Amino acid sequence: MQPLSKLMAISKPQNLSLHEQREVLRADMCWQQETIPVMETHDSEASRQKFRHFQYLKVSGPHEALSQLRELCLQWLRPEIHTKKQIIEQLVLEQFLAILPEEVRTWVHLQHPNNSEDMVTLIEDVIEMLEDEGMPCKDSAPQMGSIKEKMKAGSPTGKPQEPVTFKDVVVEFSKEEWGQLDSAVKNLYRNVMLENFRNLNSLRKAHLLSKPFESLKLESRKKRWIMEKEIPRKTIFDMKSISGEESSHGVIVTRLTESGHPSSDVWKGENWLYRNQKKWDINLPQEAFIPETSYTDEEDFECSENKETFDINSVSSICAIQQGIPSRKGSPKCDKFKTQFKFNLDSVGKQHSEYEYVNDLSLRTDIRHQKSHTTMNSYECYQCGKAFCRSSSLIRHQIIHTGEKPYKCSECGRFFNRRTNLTKHQKLHAEVKACTSNKCGKAVSKSEDGNNPALHFGNNFYECVNCGKSFNRSSSLIRHQMIHTGEKPFKCKECNKAFNRSSNLVKHQKLHTRDKS
């Protein structure tokens, strides 16, 4: 191994003569043979270059590209003759040399280290020697003093900088470009923009904390938030147009709501950002929502009976609808039902005001609430929750849950849960009595045929006057009497043959159909 003092005599690689460069390459090949004696280095470098500089455009598809890369890697590393340790050592040495500065890489080749540990020891010795001699890095031939700086290139140093604005990180689209994006890309754009804004907001807070109190006081007086779009109709207040100095807060609200960028159905206006600031951990300015109408009282807008809370578009219009009188200054009320219209106004000593949505009800819901004053069901069943407008209806309904049957038939002892059912039952008893007392066999109507077996007690109430045969249905008695009278009311239209039953006529007509076929 060459002495360390020889390092100072080595110039940059681009200043080496052709003979010296060839000497470096020859020494490099000899060093590889000494490091891994088992490896055959005749075509190792050529195979490595083919593997490292392989291009995808030279093949027809991904499968062929992967296959060729695998083949080139096998030709370079030769796993059939090299051990895993040798292959790993070769890969580590290659990568370590690649990350070194160019002048250091050339010098390391000339030293012929046996392994990666020797290479690290060489570099540490050179750095220590240069620091001891106090040699300036700029004047030295190999410029070894810059090694530490290049190793620490990723570490942030220097004085703190001013926080960047949203303009520095925003990605802009034209109207045509935005229209061609699908919903997934638009959602991704939204997430990235909100994430950038959250990061910028945190940087802004840290920057403000480092400023003196007086400068913060002056800056707070000059700030104005830029809000270009109008708040949707469903919001409570009319937003004031506020212009002023551009800030990161104002830029994101302006950027994300102007036409050509995320449309109203995606962002739902500025109101969408304010409703979601807790979800995204961002703090948007509240100055833009200072109401034009100020209330001196902090009393809630309420309806005194059912204690419901509404979100309204216009307090005065709702009170006019509910009470039919113009609203007065102060806290509007519906004195009949005490419906609350809730505001939280706290502008004393603060730069912003807050309001909260209690229920997302529209104006139509408020009108329906007024109509419900006259149709409210105030009698509710405690078991199933069903409500009724009359107490008598609730009492009848509760009989279903208790299973109570308070109405009893005095003749047969049967119970019913409703008086109407008992009345119908008693009418059947009266009809049965009239039928049994009149033994004339006269057929009664179908509703009086006594289909309820509990009333009949097994007796047939329809008796034939000719033969004394009885039936439990009037229709059966009528069909039976046709036998005695010889009546045949069912006549065939083709052959004029008559039958006393419709079923016999149907069978006869099937014979005609069979003969025709």
Swiss-Prot record:
Coiled coil: none annotated. InterPro entries: C2H2-ZF_domain, KRAB, KRAB_dom_sf, SCAN_dom, SCAN_sf, Znf_C2H2_sf, Znf_C2H2_type. GO terms for cellular component: nucleus. It holds the Pfam family zf-C2H2. Residues 48-126 form the SCAN box domain. It comes from the Eukaryota. This is Zinc finger protein 215. Its main location: nucleus. It comes from Pongo abelii (Sumatran orangutan). CDD domains: KRAB_A-box, SCAN. The gene is ZNF215.
